Amino acid sequence: MNEEYLNYCQKAYQKILAANNILIVSHLHPDVDALSSVGIMIELAESLDKKYLAYASDKDEKIFDFLPHSERIHSKLPIGFSFNDYDLVIVLDCGAINRTGLAEALHNRNKKKIYVVEFDHHPPVDHFADIEIRVPHLASATEVLYHFLKVNNITINKNLSSLLLSGILTDTGNFLYPSTSDETINIASEMLRSGAQLPKIFQNTLQNKNLASMKLWGLALKNLKLNSKYDLAVSVLTKEEIAEVKNEVGFDEASSDVFGDIIGLLGNLGGMKGVILFREELDGRVKASLRTSDPEIDISRLASLFGGGGHPKASGLLTHGKIIQKNDGWEFEY
């Protein structure tokens, strides 16, 4: 982190110390990195005896209950909630304001009374925060928060170490994704020495796949095609295939991280410069996840051609179109 971000981290901590009532927010359908980040802020708020509310819209109440403080995170805003009751809002792992579920309140807030601090590792989409601590080259939001804790000399206890390691492990695909750096590994090692429970994290993430995940993995592997011209591996999941799995075994497509798991699995294919997973949405749009481990390729440039974006090694897009099966593979019409 450069000096500017060090100053931002110090200023953000001063705002936390001065706050009377803190609203801690992450993105809708939160993943492990998002909930771990919220848990870190809960741990900090409670250690400072601060009044707070933690909120992540449509949080899965079962899958992530192994995380410290997960039971304190509201999946729906409580009855009687008023945004104006809070003088500090902390937004975590959520660059797009509409994914907080509080976009209107954040946009229309009284900036003299309500201060907003954002911690994120995604490329910027909206600039809505008063302090924006955004470090896109870091592997996870929890890695950003690790530096925040260190800058402010906050002791990393057992709860914090487990939360930090959980976010790092899941957002790096257990250190397989290109975003993993030497520093990421060193931080993870430090968290183990600080008391993080690695077997418990593995059991509840890597070894906790459901039947729907396995069936969708199978379909993605069955549909996998190789493009020898561009050294790309491409797979698709049609809306009919997704609907069939949902009808057979049931799963919440929006809250499931299965699609992220699939693109991570496809990324293990050797000899390819990149992988793309297309999936059809019910509303006629197509989502795509793009990954590369080639040091010479910025996959976000390809995503940007279709209105998407992201990191150089991991990007996504959402556009209107359809997937058409051909004899020799798939075509994407938009």
Q: Which residues are covered by each model-predicted region?
A:
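Short glycine-/acidic-enriched loop or helix-start segments at secondary-structure transitions
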Residues: A34-L35, R99-A103, F128, K287
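Glycine-rich phosphate-binding loop
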Residues: D87-T100
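Short alpha-helices
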Residues: F119-I187
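Short, conserved loop/helix-junction motifs that constitute active-site signature segments
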Residues: A103-K113
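Short glycine-rich anion-binding loops that position phosphate/pyrophosphate groups of nucleotides
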Residues: H29-P30, C94-I97, H122-P123, E240
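Short acidic-hydrophobic, aromatic-tinged amphipathic segments that line or gate anion-handling sites
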Residues: R72-I79, I133-P136
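Hydrophobic helix-and-loop "lid/oligomerization" segment in the mid-to-C-terminal part
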Residues: N2-L28, A34-P68, G80-L88, T170-Y334
